[in-house]
Amino acid sequence: MSAVLDIAEAVAGTLEDYHAEVLFFPEFELRDIEEMKVIVVPLAEEFKPLSRTQHEEILKVQVGFLKRGGEDELPELLRTVEGLGLGFLNQKLAGATCIGVAFNPIYSPEHLRERGQFTSVIELSFKQFR
């Protein structure tokens, strides 16, 4: 199985309290989102040779958070998303270690204003050696 898919499934498993799921084509209607929706998407794999027999792999996944809500809920949602993202840093999953957490966007003002939807995306970078 693909290493980046293994990481995506491990991340979703870690976020099982939020009913996270791995999806390849996430698409939702706001009316279908009652609770926070957490989606994990495999994003990228990068390989760098270290020697003739070993290489480094950088595996990236994105974790999307969607919730119907307004500006009054924003501080709590931001704290939740930041806490979840930072909780992965230095954590080992599926044989790889999380070496980077990026929030992009930490939230989307456009989605909040125009749709009444909180949208946040975390990009997690993992490193492993083979």
Per-range role (PLM):
Residues 1-30, 43-130:
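Charged, amphipathic alpha-helical segments and their flanking helix caps
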Residues 33-43:
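Short, well-ordered secondary-structure micro-motifs within conserved domains or adaptor modules
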